[in-house]
Amino acid sequence: MSDKKSNANGVYPQEAVKSDIVKNEEFIGEHLETLREFAERGDASVMYLLGCYYDGGVCEGGGNDPDEAVKWYKKVSRLGNTHAMNNLGVMYLCGQGVRKSAAKASKWFRKAAELGSVVAQKNLAEMYRYGDGVRVDSAEAAKWYRKAAEQGDAEAQGILGVMYYYGEGVRKNVAAAVKWYRKAAEQGDCGAQNNLGVCYDTGTGVAQDWAVALKWYRKAARHGNACAQTNIGEMYETGRGVVKSAVRAAKWYEKAAAQGYAGAQYDLGELYASGNGVAKDLHAAEMWYRKAAEQGYADAQYKKNSRRQENGE
């Protein structure tokens, strides 16, 4: 049930200028020569602005010239700009304007991370956690997530909670997991809200309290978290802390299944197979089992195969 957060699409965040000017690429384009003059004279803020303008990954609709972006990022990085250092790391990781190099990416992320950049700390942690161009090092990942978490970053807090929950790179400590989940959940991180709900649901690291579990599941579900939607469905199906209702369970499973969540697809298949909360429909059951099985859900694979044998297929 715990929603293990990951950057599955491999997109590492870059940092953009917080000024209104970066939102007006037309203005920048019209005054480009003047801005370049300021940058050549050593104006660090304009150097970074030009880097963002030329970097299509940061400033959509800008110059889209990775070579120029790298040039200005490097110049301003030498002056200690951590945003530029982080963005250089992303460009090396993706091979934009430079030869792709995970080693150089981690070098720039580390430089920015050591100077306190939360985004760079998370990017460096991400590389070590998933072995993206470097050797997997869960302890190193946990170290950098902790630094970002201690600066109040909700995403890092939620991930650090997961690492404590499973003992990933740190000694397993469910009390510490609950602590970090709570910090992130109170900031609105829906993954942490779901995970905190799991802890209350199961009595892991806290006294079991289904009402509190449901509260956190609902907060996450309102943000579209499919895992939380499934967990609410399971509470209604089993009557944990709520009036038992297979009809309401089906409603929540449908929300999560529509998002492609395999656990909900399997659970919905079970309801259709038994006619519990929905009209019995073996074809619908097989469809949902198949969808879950295609994502590697083992129980669904077994049920799908069983249905095929019953149908003589």
Annotate each PLM feature.
Residues 47, 85, 99, 121, ...:
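Canonical tetratricopeptide repeat
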Residues 40-43, 54-59, 78-81, 94-96, ...:
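Short helix-capping/linker turns of helical repeat alpha-solenoids
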Residues 49-59, 87-94, 123-130, 159-166, ...:
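Hydrophobic face of amphipathic alpha-helices that form TPR/SEL1-like repeat modules
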Residues 283-298:
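TPR/TPR-like (Sel1-like) alpha-helical repeat modules
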Residues 21-30, 63-67, 101-102, 137-138, ...:
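Helix-turn-helix repeat elements of alpha-solenoid scaffolds
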Residues 4-56:
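N-terminal segments that cap or nucleate solenoid repeat domains
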